[in-house]
Amino acid sequence: MVPSEIPQLSDAFKNEATAQNYIMGNVYGYIPTESSIAENPALLSTDELDIPWRNDKTNFKAYHINLGTLDTSSPYFNLWEGANGSKALYKGIREAYVFLENIDQVPDLDVAKKARWIAEAHFLIGYYHFCLLRQYGPIIVARNSVDMNAPEEQRYPRR
């Protein structure tokens, strides 16, 4: 039994405002911050750029790659698990699919706005897959959200 004051997934789609909060927070919230000099490995992990203003309080993850402190057990740009300040992009993909599966529940949603949000969710699914592919090479393409109570064969598909 779930207490009534605990929000449920259906609460996120009870009206236009809550659906907008869901897409902006739960779907857009996984976009990597590549515009930041500290968060973009293509900028500071090269020999062509150095940061003269660095100090012990500054955490430039990309610069640490240049220093040789990157290791396989705790990578700085961990888009797979979302560790070390990165965002877990497969979670973002799942949130986008959850949004697509539930957007029809929103009553009186403008048709044009609904179509735009659906297109935005599809774009972000593709963009998150692109970021994962660019980072790791061949990946598993998620084609829907998977119920976490589903059998293991459905939760972990083979390539």
Task: Give residue ranges: language-model regions.
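Acidic helix-start/capping segments at beta-turn-to-alpha-helix junctions
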Residues: 44-49, 117
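Conserved, well-structured interaction surfaces
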Residues: 16, 21, 29-33, 59-136, ...
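Short clusters of hydrophobic/aromatic residues that line enzyme substrate/ligand-binding pockets
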Residues: 13, 70, 141
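Short, hydrophobic secondary-structure boundary micro-motifs
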Residues: 39-40, 109, 141-144
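Membrane-proximal, proline-rich intrinsically disordered regions
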Residues: 1-45
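Short linear capping/connector segments at secondary-structure termini
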Residues: 5-8, 143-151
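Proline-centered turn/helix-capping motifs that create local helix->coil transitions or kinks
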Residues: 1, 35-36, 132-141
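Short, solvent-exposed loop/turn elements at domain surfaces
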Residues: 33-41, 50-55, 60-62
